[in-house]
C-alpha cells in the first residue's frame, strides 16, 4: 500500500504447480515476481531466463547460475540461531537441548549449525557440557521430519520432537515449516517441562495458541527484504545482487521473549 503497487498471489499445492503458477504471474504482466523457498530454485531460474524483461526475486535461496534479473533474498540465520543456541544452553534444566529439520537443505541446516555452535560457545564460556540432540554440525547428520511432504507433516514433526523430548531435551528448535507445529503440540503436552524456540517469524504472533511454550523466535526480516526489492523496481534501481539479511541490519535476530521476558 505504501508503494502504491498491486499484488497478485498464487499458492502451489505441489511441485507440479510451480511452473504453471509462475507463468500465470508472467502472463499477468507483473513487474516483479517473488517466489519463496529452495524448492522453487530451478523453476524460478528457468522463468527468469525465459523472461529477461521481468524482474524476479527468490526468498531463502541463492540459485547457481541465476541471471541478472533474479535477486536472491537470503538471511544469515546462523548468526541469530547462534544466539538461540547460547540462550537455550543457558536456560536448559536437563542439560540437553534439541533441534530437527524438515529437509536436509542449506536454508534449514544453517539454523541447526548456528544453534549447535551457540551451545558449543556457551559450554566453552561457562565450563558446561550442554548436549545438542538431533544435529551434529561436524558430520552434518541429524533428525529430519519423515517423508512425504516433510514441511507439512505435523504428525511427523510431533513424533520427531517427541523423540528428542524422550531423550531428555527440554528446549527444541524445530526448523520444519508447518511441521514445526508438531513440536509445539509435543511440548505443550509435556505440561511445562519443555519449550520451543520458533523460527522464521515471531511465533507468539503466528502460533499464538502456543505462546506460553515459545521462549523466543529466530526471525527473518522477509517483509523488509521484499519491500526493498519492490521499491527498487519502482525506483528503477533493481539489480540481481543478493540481499543478505544479518544481525547488523536486523535482517535476522531474536524476537521478543513475551512470557519469558523476566
Regions found by a protein language model. Name each.
Residues 1-262:
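A residue-level marker of the well-folded mature domains of exported/periplasmic proteins
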Amino acid at each position: 500500500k505504501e508503494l502504491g503497487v498491486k499484488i497478485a498471489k498464487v499458492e502451489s499445492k505441489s511441485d507440479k504447480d510451480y511452473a504453471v503458477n509462475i507463468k500465470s504471474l508472467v502472463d499477468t504482466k507483473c513487474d516483479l515476481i517473488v517466489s519463496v523457498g529452495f524448492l522453487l530454485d530451478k523453476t524460478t531460474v528457468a522463468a527468469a531466463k525465459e523472461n529477461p524483461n521481468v524482474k524476479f526475486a527468490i526468498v531463502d535461496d541463492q540459485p547457481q547460475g541465476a541471471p541478472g534479473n533474479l535477486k536472491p533474498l537470503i538471511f544469515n540465520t546462523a548468526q541469530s540461531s547462534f544466539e538461540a543456541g547460547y540462550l537455550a544452553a543457558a536456560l536448559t534444566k536437563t542439560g540437553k537441548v534439541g533441534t530437527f529439520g524438515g529437509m536436509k537443505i542449506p536454508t534449514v541446516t544453517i539454523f541447526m549449525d548456528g544453534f549447535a555452535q551457540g551451545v558449543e560457545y556457551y559450554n566453552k564460556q561457562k565450563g558446561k557440557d550442554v548436549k545438542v540432540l538431533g544435529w551434529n554440525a561436524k558430520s552434518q547428520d541429524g533428525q529430519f521430519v519423515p517423508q512425504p511432504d516433510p514441511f507439512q507433516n505435523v504428525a511427523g514433526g510431533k513424533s520427531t520432537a517427541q523423540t528428542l523430548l524422550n531423550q531428555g531435551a527440554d528446549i527444541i528448535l524445530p526448523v520444519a515449516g508447518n511441521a514445526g507445529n508438531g513440536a509445539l503440540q509435543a511440548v505443550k503436552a509435556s505440561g511445562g517441562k519443555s519449550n520451543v524456540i520458533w523460527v522464521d517469524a515471531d511465533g507468539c504472533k503466528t502460533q499464538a495458541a502456543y505462546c506460553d511454550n515459545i521462549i523466543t523466535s529466530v526471525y527473518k526480516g522477509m517483509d523488509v527484504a521484499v519491500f526493498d526489492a519492490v521499491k527498487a523496481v519502482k525506483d528503477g534501481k533493481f539489480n540481481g545482487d543478493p540481499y543478505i539479511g544479518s544481525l547488523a541490519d536486523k535482517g535476522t535476530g531474536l524476537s521478543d521473549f513475551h512470557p519469558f521476558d523476566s
